[in-house]
Amino acid sequence: MHIIGIGTDITECPRIGRMIQDHGELFLRRVYTEREIDYCNSRKQSTEHFAGRWAAKEAVLKALGTGWIRGISWRDVEIRNNPSGAPLVLLHAGTRDIAESRGVRQVLVTISHCRTYATAYAVALAQENLPPIVPSHFDDDIPF
């Protein structure tokens, strides 16, 4: 496997808490899958877990090199947990299509959070030795 993209994000837990308080189910169902909502609500500090998943979704899209382009929704990136509790990335719909078109075979993610902040780091991996994703505006000058 070869790294073709990395991404990181940090978000304020109280900000996500306010979004949940102000917009309730509308916000939750727009951003999180049913499984994510169930998982976070089952945790003692649910706001921190929602914020961690928010940061993870942002980090994954940065690792894929897409950002929030048309055709991608929050729910297209799902963060679940493997049996040992480690976060696991599942890609759906437009996000999955973009990842496959770029040769991505796996996205790894790690999440940390406290009362104030949640942070996540993601790595997109390809099976083949593909070149890194370079924005078209760089043309001949490839950044290192």
What are these regions (language model features)?
Residues 1-144:
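Core catalytic alpha/beta fold that binds nucleotide/phospho-ligands
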